[in-house]
């Protein structure tokens, strides 16, 4: 079995959630090496290499930004796997185009980046976070299995 490391970049109040889910298992350091929590746009730009134009053109909650976050964290960590997550957990902050419960995901796996958007709805901040963690874990397993 090939050993892989997972690298995460998150801006949706998930920093503790995704990492917490992984580190709750013994020997988590065998798969998790680094995680960035980049709430500020400047942090996404400085640490992950997200382009300011991408944020300006698409908004921070977008598949385009999640894409660049996933690629950025993988690049910084020199990894084959990177995950980027950005969204609106609520209770406020949503708009008609980007409502509360909308979360965008980027997955960089072995040189290929794919993105997804989930609209969990106004199910409460903690449930949006929980649903996002579940999505990340399930999708990672699926993509790594391919």
Descriptions of predicted regions:
Residues 1-146:
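Short alpha-helical segments enriched in small residues
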């Amino acid at each position: 079995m090939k050993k892989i490391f997972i690298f995460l970049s998150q801006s949706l109040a998930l920093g503790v959630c995704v990492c917490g889910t992984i580190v709750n298992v013994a020997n988590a350091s065998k798969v998790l090496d680094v995680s960035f929590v980049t709430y500020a746009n400047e942090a996404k730009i400085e640490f992950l290499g997200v382009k300011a134009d991408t944020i300006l053109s698409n908004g921070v909650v977008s598949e385009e930004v999640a894409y660049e976050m996933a690629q950025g964290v993988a690049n910084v960590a020199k990894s084959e796997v990177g995950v980027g997550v950005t969204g609106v957990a609520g209770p406020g902050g949503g708009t008609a185009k980007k409502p509360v419960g909308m979360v965008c995901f980027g997955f960089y796996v072995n040189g290929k980046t794919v993105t997804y958007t989930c609209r969990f709805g106004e199910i409460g901040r903690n449930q949006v976070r929980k649903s996002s963690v579940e999505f990340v874990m399930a999708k990672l397993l699926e993509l790594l299995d391919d």
